[in-house]
Amino acid sequence: MVNLHIFHSVSARELLEEVDIPLEVSGLGVYFHVYQDADRPFYIGISDDMAGRNRDHLENYRKKNYWMVKNPHRLTDLRCFVDDDFYSTYDFYAPGRDAVCGEWEQAVDRLFDHMTILFGKVTLLKDGVPVQQSLEEARRTVGQVERQLQDNMVLRLNLDPSWIGRTGSNRGGGLDDVAHRLSLTYADSVSVRLDERIWL
């Protein structure tokens, strides 16, 4: 059993301005990018320094290093990533390409205005008791959980597997393909709730 505890949330703007960021956010864990009040993330990532990694993400959007969806509101239901006859790169600005009349910058501003980042801590449990892990073992478990979440979203939402790269992410978990029994909990201060049916 693995528990994923969402312990903090922050808006993209607040993270850039470093407003009330707890020290724990700079540690190892899984994080999620959510648009507006969506119940599913458009990005899942892991890092040893989640706060620093997410600031890098936001700067990469500004610098045109990532694919950028032309209409960020489509990140609410992820329809722009569904694997069907309508799936197309035309829904995105490609990395490094200039958009017409500042459209890229407008899309990034809209994204940042409505983007929430959730920070989660992964704990391996045995009979309900946390298992002590080395840093290397903990990183491996976190990577396995990231990959499992990504795979479940692809399967249950019929997403094109390339959606992971479209949002700046790497393939989670290396070569590991381990299915953990997952539980999802939240701190009282976190108001965003994700749809567990797409993962668990």
Segments from the language model and where they lie:
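Boundary/linker segments flanking structured domains
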Residues: 1-42, 48-200
